[in-house]
Design a protein with these regions (language model features):
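Long, contiguous binding/interaction regions
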Residues: 1-30, 47-51, 58, 71-72, ...
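Short hydrophobic/aromatic beta-strand micro-patches
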Residues: 40-42
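Active-site beta-strand termini and strand-to-loop segments that position acidic
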Residues: 81-83
């Protein structure tokens, strides 16, 4: 397991602790120099999106990881937490449906997460990203 994947799993765990849902972890390192992994998660309100984002930030801080940038936390519709090799997108549900970020990364491989994470991960066969 790479350091990038460990970092991604820590972020996933933190997001789930704050009741994020519809999580997708995409391996994008072979497609882009931006990051190794993108994580996309959803919250049911702007307040929950903020709580998920802060939870991730706190967890990463405990792991001695510092963000390069955090954008959008004040509004809570689309928060981006950039940890260099792991970039996390936390969306308010309507914003995620509007932007459909995953459609830009159809060539990316979705990371099969172990339980207990898997039960909250979006099933690609049920997702319409067209």
């Amino acid at each position: 397991v790479t350091d990038s994947l460990k970092k991604a799993l820590a972020a996933v765990e933190a997001a789930l602790e704050k009741k994020a849902y519809d999580l997708v972890v995409l391996q994008v390192g072979h497609l882009s120099s931006i990051a190794d992994f993108f994580i996309v998660a959803t919250g049911r309100s702007d307040v929950q999106v903020q709580a998920i984002s802060r939870g991730i930030e706190e967890r990463m801080e405990r792991e001695k990881e510092r963000p390069t940038a955090i954008e959008g936390i004040k509004r809570g519709h689309w928060v981006v937490l950039d940890y260099n090799d792991v970039v996390i997108h936390v969306f308010f549900e309507p914003a995620r449906e509007f932007y459909r970020l995953e459609r830009n990364w159809t060539d990316a491989q979705e990371v099969a997460l172990p339980e207990p994470y898997r039960s909250q991960v979006r099933d690609l066969t049920l997702r319409a990203i067209g």
